[in-house]
Structure formats: C-alpha cells, structure tokens
A protein has these predicted regions:
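Short tyrosine-centred short linear motifs in exposed loops/low-complexity segments
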Residues: 110, 118-123, 210
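Structural motif
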Residues: 159-174, 181-183, 248-253
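Structured interaction patches on ligand/partner-binding surfaces of diverse proteins
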Residues: 220-242
Length: 300
C-alpha cells in the first residue's frame, strides 16, 4: 500500500503541473518576451524518490483570443550547477552537455521538468529567441533575461538587491561573488550574475548555518562586507557597490587597473570599460585615478 501511495502522490503532482502554466511567451515592444508573471515567484521543488523535482508549464500569451506567437525557442543563458531541465527523455538545460536550447511545439504548450539532488537555491536564466508572430513575421530576440529561482529542501541562503549607482551599463554581464568566512578562513563561495528585476537580484544558498562574515564583490567594483551575520534559513542582505574602477577584479584599485584602461583606451573592450558606457575613454581613466589606492572591505 505504501508503494501505491507514492505512485498516487506522483500522479497528483503531475496532474497539477499539467493543469496550469507557469510563464507565458509573447511579444513586448517589438521583441520576444516572457509576458507573465513578473517577477517569477519562487518555485518550490518536491522531494520524490531521492530527487528534488519541479515541473514548469510554458505557453503562448493570448490577446483577443489569438496567441501572439506561432513559433519560439527558449535559450538557457545561465543555470546553476546541479540543476537539470528535461523535456520528455532529453535533458535540454544544464551547465554542461546539454543543448541549452529548445523549440516550442506547434500547439504552443510545453512542460519542462527540473531536477536536483541536493538542497539549495537554484537558478535558471532564459531568453526567448527565434520567434515568429501569429501573422508569420519574425520577432526580434528577447532583451535581457528572465530569471526563475528554485528552492530545494530547506537551505540556508542569502537574498536581496544589488545596486551599483555609478555603473552605466547592464549589471547582468558582471559577476556577483558572495563569500562566507569565519575568521581568516573562507567557508564557501557562490557566484552568479545579478538580475535586478527578478524576484531578488540574487539568491545564494550555503551548506551550513552559523555566524559569518559575509563579503560580496561585483565585477569592476570594490567588495562590501557584513560582520557577524547569523545565517539560518533565508536572510536578507542588500548590497550597494559604490566604489568603481577595479577592472582587473583583485579588489584593489592600483597600477594594474590603470594600465588596463590605458592599453584599451579608445576601444570598446568590455573588461576595461570601468563605467559600462560601452567605450574606454577619459571617464574610465578618471574613475580609476579618483579611486586610486582604494581597496575592498573584503581585503581588510
């Protein structure tokens, strides 16, 4: 009887997943887009047969009784280690060895099942690409990414906002690194790109609860630090990165950063573009010179 109850429970979960959509694809401002919901709510994964599982339904958005799209594909831009998305019997989204791309079927209705083996917070960043509207016209690819957070089990995690007021570009190409420390020892490090318009700009899970020093660093910016943070369950930690110019990301603004900017001067080299405006010029040079000699709080 116990085995039958597991099967019945699984069928109930699958039936519930089949009965609704989790996000809708359409057209917004001339680009392919995820129309609803914004932001995507936290997806809680269920533990079944030793794996954490969550199935997501994807459909086309309807307007005046007609779908906005007749075709579209979904591209994985970034995915957490250990999270795998499968359609049917094929893994289509994972960190390595998957196509990280799939095409919607003709009926515009698809389910993708995600799995993970360990508790934690997992991330799937996607773009809608190669879309065609209902009248047969090609649609420009989605701008930016759409982020979905998954929660497996009861992890200890940090979440919050990421603000970089002196950076003019998109924050997504920058890497956010969050580290927990005890004394001089680094206990664990988690990295991801931030998405300010998601449910939270970042969510990062850690294996052990405890009291830690937390250090966060955003590429091209000096690190910030919070001491004696009690990490247990979900804890909010918002980050504002004010000091910019660390283009080589060693948490110190010095000769190495100055040389990077000088050698790339007049180009659009992303790594040396301190302020993110798309060109390496006087503004980047002035930022490095103004903050010359400064070091991140995580180096103290």
């Amino acid at each position: 009887m116990r085995n039958w109850s597991w099967i019945v429970g699984l069928l109930v979960i699958v039936a519930a997943a089949e009965a609704h959509w989790d996000f809708l694809l359409g057209v917004q401002n001339g680009h392919a887009a995820v129309i609803l919901p914004h932001p995507q709510p936290l997806q809680n994964m269920s533990l079944l047969f030793g794996q954490y599982i969550r199935e997501l339904g994807i459909e086309y958005y309807y307007e005046n009784g007609r779908p906005q799209l007749s075709a579209a594909s979904v591209q994985t831009v970034w995915i957490s280690p250990g999270l795998i998305g499968r359609i049917g019997s094929t893994d289509v989204a994972c960190q390595s060895g998957c196509p990280n791309y799939f095409t919607m079927p003709e009926d515009g209705h698809l389910h993708i099942r995600f799995r993970a083996t360990q508790p934690g917070i997992y991330i799937w960043d996607l773009r809608v690409v190669d879309a065609i509207d209902i009248d047969g016209n090609p649609v420009q690819d989605m701008e930016g990414v759409y982020r979905i957070y998954f929660k497996a089990g009861n992890p200890h995690y940090l979440y919050g906002s990421v603000d970089a007021p002196n950076y003019q570009g998109d924050l997504y190409p920058l890497n956010l690194t969050v580290q927990i420390r005890q004394g001089s020892q680094t206990v664990q490090t988690v990295s991801m790109p931030p998405v300010p318009n998601a449910l939270h700009a970042y969510m990062a899970s850690f294996e052990q609860a405890g009291s830690y020093t937390v250090v966060a660093k955003l590429d091209k910016h000096l690190s910030r630090r919070v001491d004696n943070l009690n990490l247990s369950g979900g804890v909010q930690a918002d980050w504002q990165f004010l000091v910019i110019g660390d283009v080589n990301n060693d948490d110190l603004i010095d000769d190495a950063d100055l040389l990077m900017v000088l050698f790339a001067f007049g180009t659009n080299e992303f790594a040396a573009d301190a302020n993110g405006d798309g060109i390496v010029d006087d503004a980047d040079l002035l930022l490095v010179l103004f903050n010359f000699g400064a070091s991140g709080e995580g180096r103290d």
